[in-house]
Structures are given as structure tokens and as C-alpha cells.
Amino acid sequence: MKRWHQVVAAMLLASTAVYAQAGREQQQGGGGQAQAGRGGQGRGGGQGRGGGQVVSTADLTVLDGWGRPLTNPLAGGKTPGPAPARDISGMWEPANGPGAGIQANGPVSMPSDGKREPPYTPAGKASYDSHKALYGYRATLPSLSNDPRNHCDPLGFPRANFYQLRHTKIIQLENQVVILYQFDKRYRVIWTDGRDFPAELPDNRWYGYSVGRWVDDATFVVNTIGLIGNERVWLDETGRPMSDQMKVEERFHRVNSHLMELTVTVEDPKFYTKPWVPMDKFPMKLQAPDYDIIEMLCAPSDMESYSTDFGDPASGIKR
């Protein structure tokens, strides 16, 4: 356990150094830039929303999850090519580095900052007020939180997009798209054979029932229903609620050969008065095909040790 923490700490330090160097190169005018976030100007032109400015790492050494150097596909001044038609396959990560996908204080386009909140119904507001989250402007002490994930319950969906969205492998098969997530080694199956949703779902699922379609050669739209909610799953780290009536739409838009934008819209008539957008054009970059990610799992025994050694003392709880 101690060794694992040392490895993660070393990786975080290395990642910080890499992106700090990228920032210095950007200030000195080195390297091209793609702009996919709210505000700021990039040399690549164009503006989007919700993801922040994309930092160029074209001339930096690329490391995989184990610190192994890889061949950087954009090294030596190479520029991204056009988006391949109807293809979002590959290994993707947040374009501004793994930390951009953590989203501890809420989804990137609706953070919990005390200034704005989603459009709750009375039932949604009551559910939200009953949640004691570890993050956000109403954060509580560790051992006082009632977040289901504190017991290593599955994050569920769409929270999988709103917390620890790190390296993501997308595999396109004949009749389905499979998405593999680094955090908790989760996977989702999205049917692409033209089927509709079942007339009746026998059971709701942690990650729901998903069907996908191409709306144009660069945009893949996924709709998901049949989700577990009602206090077993939260929408995000800050305690926003979701019910089993939630519907989710994801739009994966391939900007070019090496950049993709993810937009997520949620609709839940039980807890929200209208649909809203937690993630708007969140930029993700394509990684090297031989990128080997490091394992990240929530182990109940580790969570128990954390509570005993750190969470309880920090919360003033004596056992």
C-alpha cells in the first residue's frame, strides 16, 4: 500500500512538471495551440465552451501510466490531420492533463461554487440538502459524509463522466461501442445496431442502457436510460442528486485526428425542472496506441484504513 502511494505521488509530480513546462513554452510563443474552452485566445483559432484552453504538448516526451516514454505522434512540428469519418476509437485523456477530469468540485460546466446551481424541483432540492458531500462549497468533514462512494459502491452513470474522468479507451465493434474507464476499471456497452430502447427494462443498472448513432461523420450521440438513482447514486462529487428517471445524452464530436469534444446533457423531471448541461465541449486528446494506463481501484479495505487513520481523526471522531 505504501509503495502504491509513492508511485502515484511520483507520477503526479512528473505530470505537474510536464504541464508546467508546456505552460512556459506557451508563454514564450512556442508550439501550436488548439482552443476548445471558454475564454482566452489560442493560436489554433476557434472557440468553444466548458473545457478550458488546450495546452500544447507536441514537443514534450509522452509518458504512459507507468512512466514509460512513448513516441509522441505530434512531435517534430507535426500538426493534427482531419477527423476520420465516423471514428472515435482510441485511447483518450483530458486534453489539459489528467487533473482536468477529476472535477472534485462538480462538473466543469457547473461547479459547486455557491454562485449557481442546477434548476432543482422541490424534491431535487430536498434530496440535495440531505447529502453531505466531501467537496463543493458545502463540503463536510470526511467521516461525516454520506456519499455512497465512501463504501466503494460503483460511481454509476453519468457520474463516471463527472468524477475521475481520466484515460478512456473507446473500442468500436460491428454492433456496439465499448468504453473502458481507467478509474475503477469500469466499462460501458453502447448499442449501435439501430435498436430502440426496450419497451420495459427489467432492472435499472448502475451504468444504464445505452444506444448510439452517428448524426454526421464527426459526431456520435449516445442516449442512456434505466439508471439507478434515488440515493444509491449521486450525480457528482458535490452531492447533486439523480433519480431513476434520469436520461443522459452524450455528444462525442471529433474535431480532428487528435482532438475530441464531449458534451453531456442530463434530464430528470423528478429532480430538475428542465434539462441542463454539466459538461460542455470538454476537450479530450488522443494518446499513443501503446499507452499503458496505471490501475486505479476503490478497495473497501483501503477505504476502511483511510477512515480509521485519517478521516475519523480529521473529523474529531474517536472510536
Residue ranges with predicted function:
Residues 1-8:
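Bacterial N-terminal signal peptides that target proteins for export
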Residues 15-17:
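N-terminal signal peptide c-region/cleavage motif recognized by signal peptidases
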Residues 19-319:
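PEST-like low-complexity, intrinsically disordered acidic/proline/serine-rich tracts
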